[in-house]
A protein has these predicted regions:
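Bacterial Sec-dependent N-terminal signal peptides
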Residues: 1-21
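Extracellular/oxidizing-compartment recognition motifs
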Residues: 20-303
Length: 303
């Protein structure tokens, strides 16, 4: 009998989770444009100890999830979708290990899948059970806050990333730039709309590829990786000046001025074999400490 009750309880919880996942509550930035990547955040206060906790994200683009500042996303370009598509896709994260018994901060870094306007940016459900067996559930609504992130698409189909904007504080429990945040806008949904679940497919790092050699011509450096791959380059910089602009292929990076910093794409990939890096009049070739190629492939987690 006890085993039967456990099975029934698990089935009910699964059904509840499925119902939660398809109960879409779309939100967006109040001023949607075609190129901006958006930071979303909210906080939830618990008065009980959490036993299990999940976050289901549906989006028409890509979304990286952070819980109490820690990265809960497992893969690159998540949730998985076909390139240049904007239909809703969803994925569910078990965030139990990140949960706290007092305040849980949920933060999402959203990007459109390609430069275009779509008012349905994010739908999120945070749900689970407490140690006493009771359940909780929260959905995305106008209480969520948002602001433009440090990155956006550029006119070359890549990204422009402003390293001067702090990439860590926005997902922390306490933030000091609250004046830059605004309330989200609730968006309507289409009747009988169900997102495609892509939990079984993911973009993952296949390998880290060193360059074979490089050529320097004045302050322009070309790195040759030998065989080509799909992914991006990760560039480590040292001694770059604040506001210095560096062009890494089609990506533009604006330096923070910190002693060491890294520049790499966030929500795009590119074919890489030879990579040319140059910069503005502040840039010097010796600002580059290391260049690595990151190869991205699609895996089926059920195989």
């Amino acid at each position: 009998m006890r085993r039967l009750l456990v099975i029934i309880s698990c089935m009910l919880f699964t059904l509840m989770a499925m119902a939660q996942e398809y109960n879409l509550r779309w939100i967006s930035s109040p001023s949607v444009d075609s190129t901006a990547q958006i930071w979303f955040r909210n906080q939830y206060v618990h008065n009980k100890k959490i036993k299990k906790a999940y976050v289901c994200i549906a989006t028409t683009g890509y979304a990286d999830l952070y819980i109490n500042r820690r990265n809960a996303s497992r893969y690159y370009l998540a949730p998985y979708r076909q390139p240049y598509s904007n239909y809703p896709v969803s994925t569910t994260y078990d965030i139990t290990r990140f949960s706290r018994s007092d305040t849980t901060t949920i933060a999402v870094w959203y990007s459109p899948s390609y430069p275009h306007i779509n008012n349905r940016q994010l739908s999120l459900i945070y749900y689970g059970t407490y140690q006493d067996g009771s359940s909780f559930s929260f959905t995305s609504d106008e209480s969520w806050l948002c602001r433009p992130s440090c990155s956006q698409f550029n006119n070359k189909g890549s990204e422009t990333i402003d390293g001067r904007i702090d990439k860590n504080e926005w997902k922390a429990n306490q933030i000091n730039d609250l004046a830059l945040w605004q309330g989200c806008k609730k968006q309507p949904i289409s009747p009988n709309e169900y997102p495609h679940s892509t939990d079984n497919l993911n973009n993952t790092i296949e390998s880290i590829i060193p360059y074979h050699y490089f050529d320097v011509e004045k302050d322009t450096i070309t790195y040759d990786f030998g065989l080509g791959f799909i992914g991006f380059a990760r560039v480590t910089l040292r001694g770059a000046k604040k506001g210095e602009r560096i062009f890494i292929g089609d990506m533009e990076y604006i330096c923070s001025g910190q002693l060491d910093e890294q520049a790499c794409l966030r929500f795009t990939t590119m074919p890489v074999r030879k990579l040319t890096i140059y910069g503005d009049n502040k840039f010097r070739a010796d600002h580059i400490v290391n260049v690595e190629g990151i190869s991205i492939i699609v895996r089926n987690s059920h195989q």
